[in-house]
Amino acid sequence: SVTADNASETKVREIGQEKSS
């Protein structure tokens, strides 16, 4: 991912993990 999108992408991954959990 682009550095500028790193923060938002990390949040998306964290949210996805919480939902899958």
UniProtKB/Swiss-Prot annotation:
Subcellular location: Plastid, Chloroplast; Plastid, Amyloplast
Known pathway: Glycan biosynthesis; starch biosynthesis
Biological processes, Gene Ontology terms: starch biosynthetic process
A GO term from the CC aspect: chloroplast
Enzyme class: transferase
Claim: Zinc-finger is one of the keywords in the record: no
Keywords: Allosteric enzyme, Amyloplast, ATP-binding, Chloroplast, Nucleotide-binding, Nucleotidyltransferase, Plastid, Starch biosynthesis, Transferase
Coiled coil regions, renumbered to chain: none
Bias type Basic and acidic residues, positions: 8-21
Reactions this protein catalyses: alpha-D-glucose 1-phosphate + ATP + H(+) = ADP-alpha-D-glucose + diphosphate
Annotated spans, Disordered: 1-21
Annotated signal sequence range: none
Taxonomic superkingdom: Eukaryota
Regulation: Activated by 3'phosphoglycerate, inhibited by orthophosphate. Allosteric regulation.
EC number: 2.7.7.27
Assembly behavior: Heterotetramer.
Role: This protein plays a role in synthesis of starch. It catalyzes the synthesis of the activated glycosyl donor, ADP-glucose from Glc-1-P and ATP.
Protein name: Glucose-1-phosphate adenylyltransferase large subunit
